[in-house]
Amino acid sequence: MNAWEIWSYQPAGWPEPHPAVIVSAPNRVANKPDVNVLVCTSKTANRQALPFEVVLDEADGLDRQTLVKCDLFHLVKKDTLSNRRGDVSTERRRQIIATINRSNGWV
């Protein structure tokens, strides 16, 4: 398990798993039981991304377009992540970092 990988995540009460991007530092991912993730939509993206979202798709290893929500971090146990789905491409990593900063008012 590594930063920028996309895994399936299904919290209690959610009807289906969602793609989730690991955004914790590599040291945390390697050594701690909890990681930060950004959750994506579970359905195919059929609209433009909102200012706090980034589109992920086949270039990131997914089978369809999805929207990653960059304005809300989820702290999850690593053992609740299953089914590795892909890796965020280098360009999308830059987009996600910029969107996290912008949507949280950090820049």
Walk through the language-model features, giving the residues of each.
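Compact nucleic-acid interaction/catalytic patches
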Residues: 15-56
